Amino acid sequence: MFKVSKYRHTVGKIDKRELWYPDVNTTGNSSASTFIKANSKWVALNWQSNTGTIGLIPLKSFGKRKGETFLIHAHSSGVIDFEFNPFNEHQLVTASDDSTIKVWNIDEAIRSGATSLSSASIVCSGHSKSVECIAFNPVANNILASCSADKTLKIWDLSNGEEKYSWNFEQGSLTSLSWNYDGSLLVATGKDLKNRIIDARTGESIQVGDGNQGVKASRVVWLGNLNHFLTAGFSKMRERQLVLWSSQDLSKPIKSITLDSSTGIISPIYDQDAQLLFISGSGDSSVRVFDMNTQFTKDPAFTELSPVPSDTPSKGICALPKRALDVMEVEIDRIFKATPNNIIPITFNMSRKSKSTFADDLFPNTASTKPSLSSIDWLSGENKQPILVSLNPSDNQINNDLDDLQLNDNEPVKKSTFFIDDNTNDNSNVVEQSKSEPEQQQQEEKKISSSSSSSSPTNSSSNVINSTPSSPIVNDNIQRTGIVPKVVRSSKYRHISGSAHQKSQFYTNLKINGSTSNTCIAVNSEYVAVPMVGIGGPLAVIPLADKGRQIQVPCIEIGSQLCDYDLSQHNTSLVATGSEDSHVKVFKIPTGGIPKTTANKSNNYTTTEADFVGHNRKVISVNFHPTAENVLITSGGDMVVKLWDLNEGGAGEKLSFANVHTDMITSVDVNWTGDKILTSSKDKKMRIFDPRTNKGGLASETVTHSGSKGGKAVWLGQTGNIFSVGFNKSSEREYQLWDSRNLQSGTPLASDKLDHLSGVITPFYDEDSGVIYLAGKGDSSIRMFEINDQEPYVHYLTQFSAGTPQVGVAKFAKKTSMDVKKCEIARFYRSTDSTIEPLSMTVPRNRQEFFQDDIYPDTRQTCTPVMTSEEWFDGCIREPEFVSMKPSDMINLSDAPPPPKKEDKFVVSQEVDNTPSRDQVTNSLLSRVSNQNASSNWEQIEKLKHNFTDYDNGDISDSEWD
């Protein structure tokens, strides 16, 4: 019997846009640790830029809102952290740079009809520096913990705003706090890179141990009723990591997972009922999920489930309480993702055969809004478990109304404009205050009866509109079934998916050097090459057939630090390298590959076919020409582009373009006919060269990305367009689509932000499908976009997530080697610190026995040169040859016969004779008579028996019975 978690099939989907919260304004405060929080009534957002304002949106007011957003003008400086009171859903607590903690009672402002709030109910002013983190006790009412940059930890009683305990931590200030299940202990991380288990009443550090060793702040979360907690931070190598710890032993971690090299601080969210962990860092575009179940193991399983990708970077995430979920639709969790302009709900569901019954195996009792202890009881030393409540709607009627404030009957209710929703313009949806209660009830009944029959019980019950005009008018008929745009764009590649090959196909036991300035992996139809750790710039060139564990790795020895290299697609045995000593070398791999190293002797391959010296500084990039044979393009630190003819040995330099670039060149690419060269530079410009003209070669240029890191650009096949990726002034990664014929306009056809990660992205374009793949150095994913002539021209498809950071990615160019029988449209080789992993991008199809000619057009022949180097330098222009990818034993899908129709099942009707038999008639008559008067009619009964006996003897034939 397999021991697997029951939540392993949890699938997350982004809700359709009708359920988003648009037109929000998130803060730009980089010091803010919290951007969004939610409970079953409200969604709170760190609003605007460094204004100390919190925006409040009713949970049910999704979609376009009419009127002003309710704002809490909380602090004179930026809000760093804020929390809803778990036992009072209309109370919010904020912490700020101004060293204060404030308590806000939302219900009082709602009663008054105000649209903003600026007077706090309680102000706690015990800290002397900015408050870094606050955390409510999970069992005791009004008990709050806070830590500050003044190196103190304080415990507050918010019933009166008094400071109850205060402890100093001279080793360094604490940056993150989390309570254990019964609210007796705190786990904390600090700037001294230590983890601490602290007794919340005495301030004693029960356990102290080394935590995440990165210089950036880490976050911590206690894993419910387990004796474990998790930290999310950075390693010494500045890589983001998750670390699992036991609260009983902080000397060493139980398990750690390295994520990527992004700089965004991770926000961990833990569901203690389902034992699921959700993470997303600032600037990340995806939400990752981990199963932490302890059903079969002592320690949490810590296994990753399917992530939820998107094309929008995140500012922060939060989870909705279980009480607000649609349990009858098997909604396991709902995560809110805050972006610069929207709040995006992400629902996590599980498939069930029937949703008519409550899935009690998936929804255990959850924490209620009733405290187990008062603040006085907790301060006196008492401990209790949280009070739990059932999620079954039949056992516990959960109030789904947005505003359940208990208003006095004689108290007038003022209208708050921020509650009004314009999901519909129908005036009949607005309940006027002047209408009588019977009229309102009739309208409510009509609305309920007209609702969709497919609505879940939870959604249906929420259609009843409160009689108070302050309740929002929302359309609850919208179903949470994932992304369903109003108009679905038709595309053959919408469902493209990526998958890694089996581990037996990996190349392992490698020590890959990821510090090369440009290429970290290259591949052609015979070899894959990666730079290795070692002296002399070793470059491992491994035959593709030599899969598995590499015992002896054959290497080319450059003689200096390797900067860049390339493998020829035309002559697969040629390798070109560029190094720190400004040499450009060409090697020819012997037949069968580089000889293996022998015992006690290093036989690195050093035989060169050519050694060019032309650049005054180190060589930055090396690229073989894609259409002309033996033409090499290089760029150097001297900001010069050179073209070499490999047929002429040491005197092979043919063309040179100097005094054009004013900063380091970051990418070089050649168009599909091979006559124009595209460059990107750190001087924030993109240039097109026609290298064989007499006008200096420069054809056009434009300013692209404004960031200091520079970008990379590629030609988009026969379209004549250009796709570039880089950074903006805010260090956000972005892309731009350009028309090469109109660069002088300075305006791209399309552009958008990607995320806040720091890795340089390399774009790979597939001319046959129009799909572009974006792979960032240090990322753990590859994003896919489709580019066509439909606005906005660049359409996000999906992303492949590997779970471990990548050093580099290379695209396999030989399309005729694709496995068309599995609908493979692209293949990549992905390198990590120790492995090379092949990846396949496939399109799901039903009839894979036929050649899918709609997704496999004739492809460019990349392994055969179009012309010689002499012809190219003489100015020849020749279009590449195209070949079919169709195997000889397959039939085109367009020529295939229609699929066989399923045979209809015919039910043969049978006539059944329902005429009662003789015995049935006899017994029926006898029973009727005996029931009427059993005591006085025995003689009649005997007579009837005698008569029927005569019938049985043949006096009446069988055919006379009707």
From Swiss-Prot:
Ranges of biased composition (kind: Polar residues): 911-936
Positions of the UniProt region annotated as Coronin 2: 484-962
Annotated knockout phenotype: Shows altered chemotaxis and phagocytosis. Cells are slightly smaller, grow more slowly and do not reach the same final density at stationary phase. Affects the infection process by the pathogen L.pneumophila and allows a more efficient internalization of bacteria. Allows a more efficient uptake of dead yeast cells.
Highest taxon in the source lineage: Eukaryota
Location of region: Coronin 1: 1-438
Function: Involved in phagocytosis and cell motility. Binds to actin filaments and protects them against depolymerization.
Name this protein carries in UniProt: Coronin-B
